[in-house]
Amino acid sequence: MVYQSEYALENEVLQQLENLGYERVNIHNVEQLHDNFRTIINERHKEKLNGKPLTDREFERLMTGINGKSVFDSAMQLRDSYVLKRDDDTDLYLNFMNLKQWCQNKFQVTNQISVKDKYKSRYDVTILINGLPLVQIELKRSGVAITEAFNQIERYRRQNYTGLFRYIQLFVVSNKMETRYYANSDREIFKGQMFYWSNEQNERINYLKDFIEDFLESCHISKMISRYMVVNETDKFLMALRPYQVYAVEAILNRALETNNNGYIWHTTGSGKTLTSFKASQLLSQEENIKKVIFLVDRKDLDNQTLAEFNKFQEDSVDFTDNTRKLLKQLADPTLPLIVTTIQKMANAVKSNHSVMESYKQDKVIFIIDECHRTQFGDMHRLIKQHFENAQYFGFTGTPRFEENKSQDGRATADIFDKCLHHYLIKDAIRDHNVLGFSVEYNQTFNSHEDLDEEYISKINTSEIWMADERIEAVCRHLISNYHKKTDNGNYTSMFAVQSIPMAIKYYDTFQRLKNEGVHDLNVATIFTYQANEDAQEDENHVHSREVLDRIMNDYNQTFKTNYNTDNFEGYFSDVSKRMKEVVRDDKIDILIVVNMFLTGFDSKKLNTLYVDKNLKHHDLIQAYSRTNRVEKERKPYGNIVCYRDLKKQTDEAIEIFSQTDNTDTVLSLSYEEYLDNFKDILQDVFQLAPTPLDVDKLEAEDLKKEFVISFRDLSNTLIKLKTFDEFQFTEDELGIAEQTYEDYKGKYLNIYEEVMRGKKVDGEEGVSVLDDIDFQVELMRNDLINVKYIMDLIGQINLSDAKARDEKRHQIHKLLDKADDQQLRLKADLIRSFLDKVVPSLKEDSDINEAYYEFEDKEKTKEIDAFAEQKAFSAMLLNEAVNEYEYSGNIDRKSIGQNISEPFMKRKRKTDQIIQFIEDTVEKYGVVE
């Protein structure tokens, strides 16, 4: 029935595409795909071929030249011409797609193309443009999660997508009621890279029929591939624009080409404004009647970030101007259609009265302004506008200025940029999973709070009540006690926004004193300086002391083995920024104290918590909160905001302004109580399927196992959210399940996962199990604190001279092994148990326990290799050599293994697969622990 249901859906899709003008073709294998491609190449290049279609040898040369490339190189080739040497030694210039006149391509659709490479697979629906498979659609019946279609495509990408299938640009996955699209890649693709399509009003187009009508309409899909994908030349991967990015770029292009008016794009922080602005700049710079596109940024710390991003999208597409003289030189160069510079340098260039500037007075110049809500642009806009008489200005902002939050000169964003051309609000981005929501908690930090007038509280920024030693220490202790809950045991990092530089120094010194007293072992850093881009009006209490900053930098140098001081502040800034982005355990900043720096324009997926002891409102509040809400893995459900001031009113007001709604629930997470109720409801589903962990083993039917996996996965997802709250306690009274019972269920869940993984590796056939494409989200189960290194450290601590202490430590390690979720530790668990029970009790007091363990491990490894070799009638010596080679180089010589098996083909192939699997598992199990 499942097959029939999906088959019927497949036919609906084919019929609809046919109605939209696609030619339905019967292509069901690679040979037919090649024949069709050859026919279309001949058709599209009829004039160039002069009545002489490609010969077999010519087509073979063409296929040799364009086949076997990576996804990235195939994407580059698709967008370039190809020079084919004909049999008569003349050159033939071929192109594979009309990138400018999108409708003038040939559109075909087929289904059930069967590919047999390492494994046999059949693809649901394939869209061919000019004979190349550019869009692959994978369908699931209603009620099945589309992540299963995603996982199936991932399997195909690993096993079968070779040859012309490397030209696939976009994947579409759907279960009829929910549909998403995403770009192909040579890399691992994450589920967060699947996008919803929507209309201009940001209303999702989920229903497959509507999606096909809008997104897969032939001219649109061709335009999407031609115009709204970016081939990232630095990191070598494809990017597809999201719908709101497409609409924003189109709105800017229409405004620039059809009017002389300005406009701004309001896209929430974290939604990819840099990519949108790059694509708009790139397309505008290709227009003949536009003399120059100038991208203006505000601060030096953003210059390098924007430049790096732009040059990632297209290598060497921009050359940043680091001084006004260089800017003038670039303005004079007609071969540079796109320039990135600062507002300040452009203002200086205008003031210079240079002859180059005169030549631009009457020309059509486009200015694109990043973070256009900032006040500096308003100040310099008049000067620039007076000079460039025919310029147009397009601004990008996540937090525009309105009447409620207008700038100091009394102007709103619309006063400068006229009209909002497209908006994508924070509530839209959260709904689409493009950014995370916020979990906000408020902590009272002085007893007399309720007795103070609210207006008075807002005015006492640096008075004694906020800077009191007792209050500062209480906040530090509260933060320390909850740090691991908030940051997922240190897998993420945090920022602490405070009111002033004196407060930052006081907090820093308090954290350091508490660290010296043994209260915590967190790495705390701070960064501040007026010269490094703190706005003067936001820094009235500026008391910067170079000596204090040098002292703080010296602590930093001691911690991270660096060598910074105030003379090379930029190096310090870069290092801090890098450690906040590339979180490496034991080499990261746990808490970064800031005043204004890093609260705008700084992106880090590894930052998940913001502590706040600072008065924030309107755009400043949303900008600061948004540092935490970049999407990462499943273990980051939202951005944590911990306020040590009562910012409830300001938070609600800011959300209402920037979401254009009075419903803050669209942005804020549920309460602890609501998550707890959800947890208990899901727990009942788990109990119904398997009343005890042992009952999981009785679930023989795969459909029941699948139900258990989905229910327990949802339970774990909710548990991660609960664990971030201060009030969380893992007790049976609180949650309805004891922690050990939960761990036992988790063990059963991971057993099912490992069974499926083993089955996939050995069998590798499509549709072997309904569990094959389930999204297990094993990331949810991870506890980084209990891994092989941690257990080996505990083994090293066993006291062999005290039998009681020795057995207590053995018992402790046994308990930890029972709740192991680290993959390598689960592989080693039985080995370690055996060592603890059989070897440790017999060790002498002066034995080196670590040496004893590795000696035991080597013997067990040899036993396993010999036993497996005997079982498979394979040479133990050859198997041992293969294991050692794989351990050393990561390579397995499949051919050599096969040559040493005297069996018929199918048996030899299966045995080879089993031996390779054993080699991989053995190296993973006995591998060296870093």
Swiss-Prot record:
Q: Which family does it belong to?
A: Belongs to the HsdR family.
Domain of life of the native organism: Bacteria
Could you tell me which InterPro entries the record lists for this protein?
Answer: Helicase_ATP-bd (IPR014001), HsdR_RecA-like_helicase_dom_2 (IPR055180), P-loop_NTPase (IPR027417), Restrct_endonuc_type1_HsdR_N (IPR007409), Restrct_endonuc_typeI_HsdR (IPR004473), SWI2_SNF2 (IPR040980), Type-I_R_enzyme_R_subunit (IPR051268), TypeI_RM_Rsu_C (IPR022625)
Q: What is the lineage of its organism?
A: Bacteria, Bacillati, Bacillota, Bacilli, Bacillales
One Gene Ontology term of the molecular function aspect: DNA binding
| Additional note from the record | Type I restriction and modification enzymes are complex, multifunctional systems which require ATP, S-adenosyl methionine and magnesium as cofactors and, in addition to their endonucleolytic and methylase activities, are potent DNA-dependent ATPases.
Q: Which positions in this protein are listed as binding ATP?
A: T268, T269, G270, S271, G272, K273, T274
May I ask which residue range the UniProt record assigns to the signal sequence?
A: none
List S-S links within the chain: none
Is Cell division among the key words of this record? no
Q: What biological processes does GO assign it?
A: DNA restriction-modification system
Give the top-level enzyme category. Answer: hydrolase
Describe the reaction catalysed, as an equation: Endonucleolytic cleavage of DNA to give random double-stranded fragments with terminal 5'-phosphates, ATP is simultaneously hydrolyzed
What keywords does the record list, in alphabetical order?
Answer: ATP-binding, DNA-binding, Endonuclease, Hydrolase, Nuclease, Nucleotide-binding, Restriction system
Give the enzyme's EC designation: 3.1.21.3
Task of the protein: The restriction (R) subunit of a type I restriction enzyme that may recognize 5'-GAGN(7)TAC-3' and cleaves a random distance away. Subunit R is required for both nuclease and ATPase activities, but not for modification. After locating a non-methylated recognition site, the enzyme complex serves as a molecular motor that translocates DNA in an ATP-dependent manner until a collision occurs that triggers cleavage.
CDD domains given in the database record: DEXHc_RE_I_HsdR (cd18030), HsdR_N (cd22332), SF2_C_EcoR124I-like (cd18800)
Q: Name one Pfam family in it.
A: T1R_D3-like
The name this protein carries in UniProt is Type I restriction enzyme SepRPIP endonuclease subunit
* Record's subunit section: The type I restriction/modification system is composed of three polypeptides R, M and S.
Q: Which residues form the Helicase ATP-binding domain?
A: 254-418
